[in-house]
């Protein structure tokens, strides 16, 4: 008797639940038909909130648009501040950045310059960049030169992503080795570590900015993996042997980076990159450089990146002029007379060939 009563109760409850579910569905459909605006708001919230898209029981995957590096799902954290705020560059200062070269003065400089030329040749070969031939043909037939050797916006972005993916290696290697050297010898480093790590961080920010404009494929990822591994180990061994040569090498390398971004700006201003003329700087660039309203174009972004590379050029040429073991870092030092030009983090007193030791010590 008890068993029969229990069975009937279960069946009744099941039917009642089914009826209530059906009524709920009908009410929902009716509400959807009469409240279109509310439905669209709910749909928007559904799309923007990943937690609402979680399905406990499913047999098919959810198709979602991919972001290259999406924001982390941390509702209680509004924003993570940068450890190294970027200095403010004026438009006049950035326009004064120019292509420059420091002449070699000893065997160490010559070794560094030869290494940079070989590296530049390899990068030009891989990316199909032939500026020398383009200039020679441009004097005879500009249209044919642009057709055969002209770079598109996408090709420049590919080159920039690859360049910036390895550009952050030298500063990290040098900062790491000096950090270990300071602990091992139980002596101060006199401010070199911070500047070197900040330089590496700045190069990584360049990479993150360009990744918002171009997403590399598997081939470039493999190329970056190999190049980064080889470059890291080469810099590691070289810095142990001659830190001065490594800083001169990076100084010459940054000279080439200034050349690259100067040519990109020239092509953009000449109308050869129409896809960049209306391209806005990514939000990550706006936040990092504090770009004001009306100065958030691709040209403004390239001006800032080129100015950064010009600053790295100066910093490494300056560090290459100093005593690697005893001299303090002039970019982390406080001078007694602030009115006299001296090394700074910004580009107010930019020196393409670096500051000589006698000028800063």
From Swiss-Prot:
InterPro entries given in the database record: AOX (IPR002680), AOX_sf (IPR038659)
The keyword Transport is annotated on this UniProt entry: yes
One GO biological process term: alternative respiration
Broad class of enzyme this protein falls into: oxidoreductase
Cofactor(s) this protein cannot do without: Fe cation
Topological category with respect to the lipid bilayer: Multi-pass membrane protein
Bias (Basic and acidic residues): 343-361
GO cellular component terms given for this protein: mitochondrial inner membrane
Enzyme nomenclature, EC number: 1.-.-.-
UniProt: Fe cation 2 binding residues: 203, 254, 309, 312
Family: Belongs to the alternative oxidase family.
Stated name of the protein: Alternative oxidase, mitochondrial
Organism for this UniProt entry: Venturia inaequalis
Lineage: Eukaryota, Fungi, Dikarya, Ascomycota, Pezizomycotina
Gene (UniProt): AOX1
């Amino acid at each position: 008797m008890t068993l029969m009563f229990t069975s009937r109760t279960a069946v009744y409850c099941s039917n009642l639940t089914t009826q209530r579910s059906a009524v709920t569905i009908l009410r929902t459909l009716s509400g959807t038909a009469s409240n279109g605006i509310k439905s669209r708001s709910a749909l928007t919230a559904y799309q923007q909130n990943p937690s609402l898209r979680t399905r406990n029981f499913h047999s098919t995957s959810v198709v979602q648009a991919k972001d290259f590096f999406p924001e982390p799902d941390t509702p209680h954290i509004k924003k993570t501040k940068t450890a190294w705020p970027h200095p403010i560059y004026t438009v006049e200062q950035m326009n004064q950045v120019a292509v420059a070269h420091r002449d070699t003065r000893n065997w160490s400089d010559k070794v560094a310059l030869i290494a940079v030329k070989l590296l530049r040749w390899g990068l030009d070969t891989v990316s199909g960049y032939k500026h020398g031939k383009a200039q020679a043909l441009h004097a005879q037939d500009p249209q044919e030169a642009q057709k055969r050797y002209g770079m598109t916006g996408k090709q420049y972005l590919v080159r920039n992503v690859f360049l910036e993916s390895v550009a952050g290696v030298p500063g990290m290697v040098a900062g790491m080795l000096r950090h270990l050297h300071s602990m091992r010898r139980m002596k101060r480093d006199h401010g070199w570590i911070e500047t070197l790590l900040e330089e590496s961080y700045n190069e990584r920010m360049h990479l993150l900015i360009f990744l918002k404009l171009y997403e590399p494929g598997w081939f470039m990822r493999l190329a970056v993996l190999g190049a980064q591994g080889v470059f890291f180990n080469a810099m590691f061994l070289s810095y142990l042997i001659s830190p001065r040569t490594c800083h001169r090498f990076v100084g010459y390398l940054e000279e080439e980076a200034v050349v690259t971004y100067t040519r990109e700006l020239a092509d953009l201003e000449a109308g050869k990159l129409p896809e960049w003329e209306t391209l806005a700087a990514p939000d990550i660039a706006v936040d990092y450089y504090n770009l004001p309203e009306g100065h958030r174009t691709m040209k403004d972004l390239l001006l800032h990146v080129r100015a950064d590379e010009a600053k790295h050029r100066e910093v490494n040429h300056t560090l290459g002029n100093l005593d690697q073991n005893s001299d303090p870092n002039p970019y982390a030092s406080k001078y007694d007379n602030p009115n006299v030009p001296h090394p700074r983090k910004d580009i107010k007193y930019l020196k393409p060939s670096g500051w000589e030791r006698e000028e800063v010590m």
